[in-house]
């Protein structure tokens, strides 16, 4: 089995759509798509992913199924009362409500009490800090809390517990495994049992965080190792395949991570999205 993970094009997060650059990237991806031998396609319900997929699907004459759990993996983190986490997330926003809705929630999945934590009390006052995504941790904090990079111990870290990350992680990876089982590969603890060996290709048009979570599950590493160590550019393609070295037992291996051949072929600059400054003194890049 072959899996392709495609990140959406350069995003306008406020309106959940593509920027003009993102539209060019999506067109470049579509023009190159026949070289990827794309098979059965699935996509996130978020507008930026659906818009990206639409270029490819139209070019190839294909359709895609929308899967709600393919939306971005963005359980919120509430650091109010845990101000020591400002060391990890010094860029957390003040609580103006701007991150409580839209692409920062998981409809039908986010626990209502989580959102209530950021709402006003009986006096109309809310907590000082708003929600923050659970990655983009400062390197110095990560160095002091290496449990975040452990394949098992990340689950008991302060950040994981505060953000209910194991709950969301298990939900999403569980849905993913259900889909793989429908296509012949059933997860059993660490391995996949091959119930119907095949060389089918499944394509997922989705998001950076969600891709990191799913790939960490396939490669048996902490999600934080992927979230902190990888910046898959908009419209990049990552390829993983099964290896059945023992009859009936499959594991996954990454062949390509963040491939942007289509952008380079078209002369389109690769977006800086998801990256931070290459040098601290570069004020033009995100800190």
Where are each of the predicted segments found?
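Conserved glycosyltransferase catalytic-site signature
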Residues: 50, 208, 234
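Active-site-proximal alpha-helix that buttresses catalytic centers in soluble enzyme cores
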Residues: 1-75, 82-97, 162, 166
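Acidic, low-complexity terminal tails and accessory targeting/binding regions
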Residues: 76-93, 174, 182-200, 213-287
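Low-complexity, flexible helical/coil segments
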Residues: 38-44, 76-80, 100-106, 238-244
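Phosphate-handling substructures
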Residues: 61-183
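Glycine-rich phosphate-binding loops at beta-strand->alpha-helix junctions
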Residues: 47, 210-211
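Generic beta-sheet signal
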Residues: 3, 200-206
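Active-site metal-binding loops of divalent metal-dependent hydrolases
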Residues: 9, 208-209, 258-260
